[in-house]
């Protein structure tokens, strides 16, 4: 089923992008705090 591949990619992006965003925010806050 090709839909499964598309769903897996969409789910991976849906989880990956917010994680990167949070890591970038945390890095900015950490560098500012120190």
Swiss-Prot record:
TM region positions: 6-26
Disulfide-bond pairs as recorded: none
Subcellular location: Cellular thylakoid membrane
Membrane-protein topology: Single-pass membrane protein
Organism: Acaryochloris marina (strain MBIC 11017)
Taxonomic classification: Bacteria, Bacillati, Cyanobacteriota, Cyanophyceae, Acaryochloridales
GO biological process, one term: photosynthesis, light reaction
Membership in a protein family: Belongs to the PsbM family.
Functional summary from the UniProt entry: One of the components of the core complex of photosystem II (PSII). PSII is a light-driven water:plastoquinone oxidoreductase that uses light energy to abstract electrons from H(2)O, generating O(2) and a proton gradient subsequently used for ATP formation. It consists of a core antenna complex that captures photons, and an electron transfer chain that converts photonic excitation into a charge separation. This subunit is found at the monomer-monomer interface.
One GO cellular component term: plasma membrane-derived thylakoid membrane
Name this protein carries in UniProt: Photosystem II reaction center protein M
Domain of life assignment: Bacteria
Keywords from the UniProt entry: Membrane, Photosynthesis, Photosystem II, Reaction center, Thylakoid, Transmembrane, Transmembrane helix
UniProt subunit comment: PSII is composed of 1 copy each of membrane proteins PsbA, PsbB, PsbC, PsbD, PsbE, PsbF, PsbH, PsbI, PsbJ, PsbK, PsbL, PsbM, PsbT, PsbX, PsbY, PsbZ, Psb30/Ycf12, peripheral proteins PsbO, CyanoQ (PsbQ), PsbU, PsbV and a large number of cofactors. It forms dimeric complexes.
